[in-house]
Curated annotation (Swiss-Prot):
InterPro entries hit by this protein: DNA-dir_RpoC_beta_prime (IPR045867), RNA_pol_asu (IPR000722), RNA_pol_II_repeat_euk (IPR000684), RNA_pol_N (IPR006592), RNA_pol_Rpb1_1 (IPR007080), RNA_pol_Rpb1_3 (IPR007066), RNA_pol_Rpb1_3_sf (IPR042102), RNA_pol_Rpb1_4 (IPR007083)
Modified-residue entries (Phosphoserine), positions: 27, 217, 1843, 1845, 1847, 1849-1850, 1857, 1861, 1864, 1868, 1875, 1878, 1882, 1896, 1899, 1906, 1913, 1917, 1920, 1927, 1931, 1934
Annotated Zn(2+) 2 binding sites: C111, C114, C154, C184
Sites of N6-acetyllysine modification: K1866, K1887, K1922, K1936
Organism: Cricetulus griseus
Ligand binding (Mg(2+) 1): N493, D495, D497, D499
Residue positions, PTM Phosphotyrosine: Y1860, Y1867, Y1874, Y1881, Y1909, Y1916, Y1923, Y1930
Cross-link (Glycyl lysine isopeptide (Lys-Gly) (interchain with G-Cter in ubiquitin)), chain numbering: K1268
PTM sites of type Symmetric dimethylarginine: R1810
Region (Bridging helix): 832-873
Name of protein: DNA-directed RNA polymerase II subunit RPB1
Biological processes annotated in GO: positive regulation of RNA splicing; transcription by RNA polymerase II
Chain sites annotated for binding Zn(2+) 1: C71, C74, C81, H84
Positions of post-translational N6,N6,N6-trimethyllysine modification: K1866, K1873
Gene this protein is translated from: POLR2A
Length: 1970
């Protein structure tokens, strides 16, 4: 669809991409215009007399009815006709239920009578709204609505303005104002809705109808809306062009086409109509009835009923789930499916059919393991392979293979299913009688069966992350399941217990290329989610690897040979055996070392490694062989296990991937598996019941432990019964008891488990699996052998089910271990029935949990993805969403991709000042130490040179500053960070590669180190730009890495620790730079989806419910999925809101002070400190009823300070709890004060002393005096005293705050045990120290109040309530808090997610300046397009809004494009490729007129001597011959610049404009990347370093077949000798033409006219002379300035900077030649310019080549025409066998210079004397001309270069020899454009005359008798002014027209003016080069 070509055969019409989608409401006129049923649909019936009825609901004009029929409107058949809308004219308008709410809003904004806006549009507020809501019509309506809500009168002009205080000038302005608004001044009704009806009510009686409330008919609303002006529509957020308010009321109802409501034909004749058709029938019926009644003048109530019914039917057609309305049913009682239900929900139209569809070319079956496949292969059953097809385009190269497949048809396996002819006909081979009769032609497509090597996508649902869909290569295997390598199960999360997987076969070559380059399994080994590998070695291989690398594994010679057989990368050398006598034995480690690729270095530990071995004097000795050291690719010591080969960061696999690349790592995986599994076959591994039996002593031990544990539990129970158990702080007695019991039982289980494990021997097979990490854990072993342990439900012991017991077998209230679910048996011993039951309870809980969790996390993941789906890295490296809002300025804040970073330690952060100085300061005073580390001359330099010493001091200063910065960034002293380029490992690599001896002094100058690091850090650019902001951003992005770089590569460590040589150091810097650049995130990467998956995937692994920390007396916090849900929903009320309060100063260390603060925070009510309350009738206070209070009460009443008479006889006595009072530091006085403050004088409150035995408050009501008098009268109303007192009591207990903050219900105080909560300080001597300080943690939050408390640290105190942090501290704080909370949730169960994903989520949620929840309320309130929103949630509402407001969707996001089936702007879709049209002229046409190049059978040209695995070439690889030929057809004579002699391209006049005759410069030929064959540096297919040089080897090169091992199998189409466009018989090609390229066969070196002694005619012809850069034999490294390049030739000024061969920008015009491309590195040995074949003295180098023009831009050395092959190579020369070393050093495939090999000259035979250019018989017109024998006829099939036996001169040159493919399309020496020196080279154009200065026409070699060559021939006459070399235009070097006649000194080719640097001559000045 992209780009406009015809899509896949369905419709021939070209499609353009949709740029935006406009929504709107259709107006009645538009509906009628669009409708195909004139006059509307009148009849509810569908058929009449068995025929569809015109004007009925199956009107034949609306679409096709029968399968066989045609549409009456468009005459299309079922597949073609899209259906056409009809319409129904409603008798009366009705409301559209989707717009009902909008209708009401608009009604409330305009005047009910005059339709004016209720707010004057000149009102400044309106202007403000309009300015603020550009492009957001919905927002505009909301704001205007808010303004209008308060208006209840439609004002006239003046009052309106005065009200707003607008100054009123007198006179005319007044009138204009009044006109301006001119309201009618009437009161506005309130609009109410009931069901589907609207009512208007007035506060005052309405003037018109004298009623307060009237029914608002749709007509009336329609009238009001009609009168609204367009301007006011706009203010109301409508877009008058697309959606006017009155259109929201249905007057004409569109009838959907038949294809939308197809009728189902049942058996028999009856049709089952669709729900919509039923609904429409109802509407038509009632509409007709209404119209009849109206015409007949029926009673008003009848009509009203009809309208109501019509309204109901229209509404339920749109939405049948309306609240408050009955459902519209079918007869059967099933609710009808309305339009809304069709769209919404998972199965609806949007999510079910547009966003996701079922696809073709997919297969699904069960998976089974196969360790012998490579990780990127998948075994496909033959039955599937024979059913799935791939459409391959027929080209001359694959025609034979495809013809064979077609012959086999569909019945045999490698066959084909269909042929698609170029006219679109599809031939089905399944039903074709004789497929062998079908002939193919190029351009047809053959749908062939899937075969080995095809690329497919393999997927397992649920697709949680991008590693759930990966590219694999097919391997056809027998039987019916997919087979895959064991290691790939981890990313797919697959196992083989019956899982099924899906396979998709991509149908185009682009898709294939993308999968191969981006999604193949090996490229996915390292996940960006947590920067570690996702695949490791698993199962039996892992078990075996651990056994195999133990110390005592020895292998015999036979075994070793056998294993080496399985090592695919084995080089044929058997290593020296470790043991020689008595017989040679090899160790397992030796064999494993052969598997390890490259020079890998790695240190890990084995799983059983004891920690105490890491430090101490013996840290280098590992007695248990548990330290793994791999050095330089050799396993030196250590047993490998899951730690080294698993999916952990820094494992061997990870390092291999980072250092060696994905392909080598793929082999590593395969080799480990094949070799080790085959060893395991010899060795064996089994497990039986015997492995699970321990010895009797162990069993005794276990019994005793359990007995003791039970005893302990009983003791605890007794303690609890006797009330001796002290509750731990913050817990109740029950909790304390449970915690203790749990602890005892868990300890018992652990203890028995460990004793069981100790008893197992080293050879136990259980143990060997656990130790290697393959399966199982220690718990599993202990459960099998010792004890199963306690069963839990919801984190507690099994609860009592009924009657206080768990099961009826136990007594009531039994808290003992057995009754509450402790299983004391092991699995081996078997469980008792009760134990079994409890065990099942625990297990069942796990199942339920899993099921619930899956749904929860699935939804979370979907929301995450939808909220971030379009967030991507753009080409300016910022991270933006689809509406181009910046989310992050640099991805992950450092601009790096997640896959390429690793954990590293910052060396300077931790050590104390002393250690820091010792390690990092270069001590130039200590001479002895210097001599040990540096070489003598360096020592002298350092000691004597003050400048150096200053530099070194400065370096140390810089590191000290870095350390300060680090300590601010990481205040906790945690030095583990994630950075690119593992420096320590790179240094280690350097030491190995350069064989550094760490004991010898180094020759690396300290200053060089300092300078080198400085230079390097300048090169590591993340943010380009030189303005202050960019510079700051660059510093922020690279700060950590630079610090790390400076501290690792500091001069001291270089000299002392690493001892690198200068050379090694340079290599290291280069390596760091390139690795760093590779780590930068790619633009186009969809980081949003990546982040969403990286968070969603670990969430799936989390447990759903919160297990509380058993036994810890801390608050419970929500964790896991519920907490994640709270965070991303931004819930206002989290389940467990909590503050962490840090304290200041003394309080932090002093428990008492901390307790004071705790009391100040914790909310205390009276209830919390009350022991009991009672109400007494106690009329006489002096002798109180409560005897114990008598004493102190008397004290009060002896001297009352109040009126004793007023006291009520009722007494409220409150007894307080002494313990709680002291806990909360409360005194009686405080409480009494609070009571008095609350109730004042109405209560009398007395209390006893704080030290009294019981603390008592006595409270009485005080009656006021007046009440005393009037008591009798008012008895009725007054509450009794005792009742009143009771109310006061409850009020006091609950509502009265004694102290603290209301929201904070409880505060816990604790000393942190973990370091992350301790206070970290830095001591004087610079060490980190963690101090324990008291921390308060609260239940409930009130951040604002707590922060303002005294002694609270306002900086560190924080809340876990996100919303609260936002309100208190703002958006930046909440972003950090959110990030921290998310990190906490994820890391709680030990997962790790790279920071950049969390950061991206937090930034997405906060980048708008407010918190955006990841729910429909957040995501769908953004400014994204309606299509994206409707694909998330609220589908119909979103679309209705969009329509009503006339919104448009700019189609920038992912969902939008997927819905419309377009390429989304993501990844490879977010850029376009620029086609260089100029270059297209040089495209080669593929000769399509030969029956088949491969006619000679498999050895023919197709398979070459290196048959490719696919058998030839994948057809679709040659896009050229689909209509593109002319575009690339510079070769076809019909095209202007072709070779036709008269064609403009070659006429001297045309060229002269362009080039001033400089032969090398012509518009027709400039080989830049656009030329179809040029390989681009990124060319994915570079099979060999050499190959890259050949331009024809680019992926697009038609002939290129990616899998052909030899590179150029000679099938390149462009070379068929019979191709009309350059068949030598073509007239313009006459070889006798003088300028016919000398390498053309007709100048055979043996032909007399070609004497190599002629100075200017070196055997390879001057036109290929080395000075012609386009033919430089050294190709890329050839540069005219390259000093080794004939330095004596003046034209190569060695000083010209612009050509330095090492300059990376070396290829000014073509990326494909960039010297950095692997295959052309100038240092590559094959390019050495001194290689014999390029010695500057070789005649072929003569700088005097006539046509060489150094200034010609297309001769830049990048011109593809420089074949790297040796110029002087002549195949007939004996020493040039193709094996000769300098034969084409970089490109095996061809040497254009070999005259004998120009395949395009079919009849050429280098030794044939008759072939001289003058040979009369070689007339261009003789097509079948054969110089020596009929078999040479160029069209003769035998002669095709594909004929294997054809060899022009010697057997070595068979064209099938892959080394020599004649077919490289670009280098045809005979191609006119390939005369490298003259692009426009048409043999007949005069331009190329021999008069070029060095081409001396009198040179004897040129047989002057040659008729065409006559030097006097006018066209070439050397004197002809047009072509005279002296003519200014011709001077090859003279751009400016200065005359260089060849006789003039200036033109001597050796004269200095000819030098490239001479300013007068370089049009392509150095700036162009760089």
């Amino acid at each position: 669809m992209h780009g406009g070509g015809p899509p896949s055969g369905d419709s021939a019409c070209p499609l353009r991409t949709i740029k935006r989608v406009q929504f709107g409401v259709l107006s009645p006129d538009e509906l009628k215009r669009m409708s195909v049923t004139e006059g509307g649909i009148k009849y509810p019936e569908t058929t009449e007399g068995g025929r569809p009825k015109l004007g009925g609901l199956m009107d034949p004009r609306q679409g096709v009815i029968e399968r066989t029929g045609r549409c009456q409107t468009c005459a299309g058949n079922m597949t073609e006709c899209p259906g056409h809308f009809g319409h129904i004219e409603l008798a009366k308008p009705v409301f559209h239920v989707g717009f009902l709410v909008k209708t009401m809003k608009v009604l409330r904004c305009v005047c009910f009578f005059c339709s004016k806006l209720l707010v004057d549009s000149n009102n400044p507020k309106i202007k403000d709204i309009l300015a603020k809501s550009k492009g957001q019509p919905k927002k505009r309506l909301t704001h205007v609505y808010d303004l209008c809500k308060g208006k209840n009168i439609c004002e006239g002009g003046e009052e309106m303005d005065n009200k707003f205080g607008v100054e009123q000038p007198e006179g005319d302005e007044d009138l204009t104002k009044e006109k301006g608004h001119g309201g009618c001044g009437r009161y506005q009704p309130r609009i109410r809705r009931s069901g589907l009806e609207l009512y208007a009510e007035w506060k005052h009686v309405n003037e018109d109808s004298q009623e307060k409330k009237i029914l608002l008919s749709p007509e009336r609303v329609h009238e009001i809306f009609k009168r609204i002006s367009d301007e006011e529509c706009f203010v109301l957020g409508m877009e008058p062009r697309y959606a006017r308010p009155e259109w929201m009321i249905v007057t004409v109802l569109p009838v959907p086409p038949l294809s939308v409501r197809p009728a189902v034909v049942m058996q028999g004749s009856a049709r089952n109509q669709d729900d919509l058709t039923h609904k429409l029938a109802d509407i038509v019926k009632i509409n007709n009835q209404l119209r009849r009644n109206e015409q007949n003048g029926a009673a008003a109530h009848v009509i009203a009923e009809d309208v109501k019914l019509l309204q109901f039917h229209v509404a339920t057609m749109v939405d049948n789930e309306l609240p408050g309305l009955p459902r519209a049913m079918q007869k059967s009682g099933r609710p009808l499916k309305s339009l809304k239900q069709r769209l919404k929900g998972k199965e609806g139209r949007v999510r079910g059919n547009l966003m996701g569809k079922r696809v073709d070319f997919s297969a699904r079956t069960v998976i089974t393991p196969d360790p012998n496949l490579s990780i990127d292969q998948v075994g496909v059953p033959r039955s599937i392979a024979a059913n799935m097809t791939f459409a391959e385009i027929v080209t001359p190269f694959n025609i034979d293979r495809l013809q064979e497949l077609v012959r086999r048809g569909n019945s045999q396996y490698p066959g084909a299913k269909y042929i698609i002819r170029d006219n679109g006909d599809r031939i089905d081979l399944r039903f074709h009688p004789k497929p062998s009769d079908l002939h193919l032609q190029t351009g047809y497509k053959v749908e062939r069966h899937m075969c080995d090597g095809d690329i497919v996508i393999f997927n397992r649902q649920p697709t949680l992350h991008k590693m759930s869909m990966m590219g694999h290569r097919v391997r056809i295997l027998p039987w019916s399941t997919f087979r895959l390598n064991l290691s790939v199960t981890t990313p797919y999360n697959a196992d083989f217990d019956g899982d099924e997987m899906n396979l998709h076969l991509p149908q185009s070559l682009e898709t294939r290329a993308e999968i191969q380059e981006l999604a193949m399994v090996p490229r996915m080994i390292v996940t960006p989610q947590s920067n570690r590998p996702v695949m490791g070695i698993v199962q039996d291989t892992l078990t075996a690897v651990r056994k195999f690398t133990k110390r005592d594994v020895f292998l015999e010679r036979g075994e070793v040979m056998n294993l080496l057989m399985f090592l695919s990368t084995w080089d044929g050398k058997v290593p020296q055996p470790a043991i020689l006598k008595p017989r040679p034995l090899w160790t397992g480690k030796q064999i494993f070392s052969l598997i390890i690729p490259g020079h890998i270095n790695c240190i890990r530990t084995h799983s059983t490694h004891p920690d105490d071995e890491d430090s101490g004097p013996y840290k280098h000795i590992s007695p248990g062989d548990t330290k793994v050291v791999v050095e330089n690719g050799e396993l030196i010591m250590g047993i490998l296990c899951k730690k080294s080969l698993g999916t952990s960061a820094g494992s061997l696999v990870h390092i291999s991937y980072l250092e060696m690349g994905h392909d080598i790592t793929r082999l590593f995986y395969s080799n480990i598996q094949t070799v080790i599994n085959n060893w395991l076959l010899i060795e064996g591994h089994t497990i039986g019941i015997g492995d699970s039996i321990a010895d009797s002593k162990t069993y005794q031990d276990i019994q005793n432990t359990i007995k003791k544990a039970k005893q302990d539990v009983i003791e605890v129970i007794e303690k609890a019964h006797n009330n001796e158990l002290e509750p731990t702080p913050g817990n109740t007695l029950r909790q304390t008891f449970e915690n203790q019991v749990n602890r005892i039982l868990n300890d018992a289980r652990d203890k028995t488990g460990s004793s069981a494990q100790k008893s197992l021997s080293e050879y136990n097979n259980f143990k060997s699996m656990v130790v290697s990490g393959a399966k199982g854990s220690k718990i599993n072993i202990s459960q099998v052998i010792a004890v199963v342990g306690q069963q839990n439900v919801e984190g507690k012991r099994i609860p009592f089910g009924f009657k206080h017991r768990t099961l009826p077998h136990f007594i009531k209230d039994d808290y003992g271990p057995e009754s509450r679910g402790f299983v004391e048996n092991s699995y081996l011993a078997g469980l008792t029935p009760t134990e079994f039951f409890f065990h099942a309870m625990g297990g069942r809980e796990g199942l339920i949990d899993t099921a619930v969790k899956t749904a929860e996390t699935g939804y979370i993941q979907r929301r995450l993805i939808k909220s971030m789906e379009s967030v991507m890295v753009k080409y300016d490296a910022t991270v933006r969403n689809s509406i181009n809002q910046v989310v992050q300025l640099r991805y992950g804040e450092d601009g790096l991709a997640g896959e390429s970073v690793e954990f590293q330690n910052l060396a300077t952060l931790k050590p104390s000042n002393k250690a820091f100085e010792k390690k990092f300061r270069f001590d130039y005073t200590n001479e002895r130490a210097l001599r040990r580390t540096l070489q003598e001359d360096l020592v002298k330099d350092v000691l004597s040179n003050a400048h150096i010493q200053n530099e070194l001091e400065r370096e140390f200063e810089r590191m000290r500053e870095d350390r300060e910065v680090l300590r601010v960034i990481f205040p906790t002293g945690d030095s583990k960070v994630v950075l690119p380029c593992n420096l320590l490992r790179m240094i280690w690599n350097a030491q190995k590669i350069f064989h550094i001896n760490p004991r010898l002094p180094s020759d690396l100058h300290p200053i060089k180190v300092v300078e080198g690091v400085k230079e390097l850090s300048k090169k590591l650019v993340i943010v380009n730009g030189d303005d202050p902001l960019s510079r700051q951003a660059q510093e922020n992005a690279t700060l950590l890495f630079n610090i790390h770089l400076r501290s690792t590569l500091c001069s001291r460590r270089m000299a002392e620790e690493f001892r690198l040589s200068g050379e090694a150091f340079d290599w290291l810097l280069g390596e760091i730079e390139s690795k760093f650049n590779q780590a930068i995130a790619h633009p186009g990467e969809m980081v949003g989806a990546l982040a969403a998956q990286s968070l969603g995937e670990p969430a799936t692994q989390m447990t759903l419910n919160t297990f509380h920390y058993a036994g810890v007396s801390a608050k419970n916090v929500t964790l896991g999925v519920p907490r994640l849900k709270e965070l991303i929903n931004i819930s206002k009320k989290p389940k467990t809101p909590s503050l962490t309060v840090f304290l200041l100063g003394q309080s932090a260390r002093d428990a008492e002070r901390a307790k004071d603060i705790l009391c100040r925070l914790e909310h205390t009510t009276l209830r919390k400190v009350t022991a009991n309350t009672a109400i007494y009738y106690d009329p006489n206070p002096q002798s109180t009823v409560v005897a114990e209070d008598q004493e102190w009460v008397n004290v009060y009443y002896e001297m009352p300070d109040f009126d004793v008479a007023r006291i009520s006889p009722w007494l409220l006595r409150v007894e307080l709890d002494r313990k709680h009072m002291t806990d909360r530091k409360l005194t009686m006085e405080q409480i009494a004060e609070k009571i008095n403050a609350g109730f004042g004088d109405d209560l009398n409150c007395i209390f006893n002393d704080d030290n009294a035995e019981k603390l008592v408050l006595r409270i009485r009501i005080m009656n006021s005096d007046e009440n005393k008098m009037q008591e009798e009268e008012e008895v009725v109303d007054k509450m009794d005293d005792d009742v009143f007192l009771r109310c006061i009591e409850s009020n006091m207990l609950t509502d009265m705050t004694l102290q603290g903050i209301e929201q904070i219900s409880k505060v816990y105080m604790h000393l942190p045990q973990t370091d992350n909560k301790k206070k970290i300080i830095i001591t004087e001597d610079g060490e980190f120290k963690a101090l324990q300080e008291w921390i308060l943690e609260t239940d409930g939050v009130s951040l604002m109040r707590v922060l303002s408390e005294k002694d609270v640290d306002p900086v560190r105190t924080t809340s876990n309530d996100i919303v609260e942090i936002f309100t208190v501290l703002g958006i930046e704080a909440v972003r950090k808090a959110l990030e921290r909370e998310l990190y906490h949730v994820i890391s709680f169960d030990g997962s790790y997610v790279n920071y950049r994903h969390l950061a991206l989520l937090c930034d997405t949620m906060t980048c708008r300046g407010h918190l955006m929840a990841i729910t429909r309320h957040g995501v769908n309130r953004q400014d994204t397009g309606p299509l994206m929103k409707c694909s998330f949630e609220e589908t119909v509402d979103v679309l209705m809004e969009a329509a009503a407001h006339g919104e448009s969707d700019p189609m920038k996001g992912v969902s939008e494009n997927i819905m419309l089936g377009q390429l989304a702007p993501a990844g490879t879709g977010c850029f376009d490729l620029l086609l260089d049209a100029e270059k297209c002229k040089y495209g080669m046409e593929i000769p399509t007129n030969i029956p088949g190049l491969g006619a000679a059978g498999p050895t023919g040209m197709f398979f070459g001597s290196a048959p490719s695995p696919m058998g030839g070439i994948s057809p679709a690889m040659t896009p050229w011959n689909q209509g593109a030929t002319p575009a690339y057809g510079a070769w076809s004579p019909s095209v202007g610049s072709g070779m036709t002699p008269g064609a403009a391209g070659f006429s001297p006049s045309a060229a002269s404009d362009a080039s001033g005759f400089s032969p090398g410069y012509s518009p027709a030929w400039s080989p830049t990347p656009g030329s179809p064959g040029s390989p681009g540096p990124s060319s994915p297919y570079i099979p060999s370093p050499g190959g890259a040089m050949s331009p024809s080897y680019s992926p697009t090169s038609p002939a290129y077949e990616p899998r052909s091992p030899g590179g150029y199998t000679p099938q390149s189409p462009s070379y068929s000798p019979t191709s009309p466009s350059y068949s030598p018989t073509s007239p313009s090609y006459s070889p006798t033409s003088p300028n016919y390229s000398p390498t053309s066969p007709s100048y055979s070196p043996t032909s007399p006219s070609y004497s190599p002694t002629s100075p200017s005619y070196s055997p390879t012809s001057p036109s290929y002379s080395p000075t012609s850069p386009s033919y430089s034999p050294t190709s890329p490294s050839y540069s005219p300035t390259s000093p080794s390049y004939s330095p004596t030739s003046p034209s190569y000024s060695p000083t010209s900077p612009s050509y330095s061969p090492t300059s990376p920008s070396y290829s000014p015009t073509s990326p494909s030649y960039s010297p950095t491309s692997p295959s052309y590195s100038p240092t590559s040995p094959s390019y050495s310019p001194t290689s014999p074949s390029y010695s500057p003295t070789s005649p072929s180098y003569s700088p005097t080549s006539p046509n060489y023009s150094p200034t010609s831009p297309n001769y830049t050395p990048t011109s593809p025409s420089y074949s790297p092959t040796s110029p002087s190579y002549s195949p007939t020369s004996p020493n040039y066998t193709p094996t000769s070393p300098n034969y084409s050093p970089t490109s095996p495939s061809y040497s254009p210079t070999s005259p004998s090999y120009s395949p395009t000259s079919p009849s050429y035979s280098p030794s044939s004397p008759r072939y001289t250019p003058q040979s009369p018989t070689y007339t261009p017109s003789s097509p079948s001309y054969s110089p020596s024998s009929p078999s040479y006829s160029p069209t003769s099939p035998k002669y095709t270069p594909t004929s294997p036996s054809y060899s022009p001169s010697s057997p070595e040159y068979t064209p099938t020899s892959p080394k020599y493919s004649p077919t490289s399309p670009k280098y045809s020496p005979t191609s006119p454009k390939y005369s490298p020196t003259s692009p426009t080279y048409s043999p007949t154009t005069p331009k190329y005359s021999p008069t070029s200065p060095t081409y001396s026409p009198t040179s004897p070699v040129y047989t002057p008798t040659s008729p065409k060559y006559s030097p006097t021939s006018p066209t070439y006459s050397p004197t002809s002014p047009k072509y005279s070399p002296t003519s200014p235009t011709y001077s090859p070097t003279s751009p400016k027209g200065s005359t260089y006649s060849p006789t003039s000194p200036g033109y001597s080719p050796t004269s200095p003016t000819y030098s490239l640097t001479s300013p007068a001559i370089s049009p392509d000045d150095s700036d162009e080069e760089n």
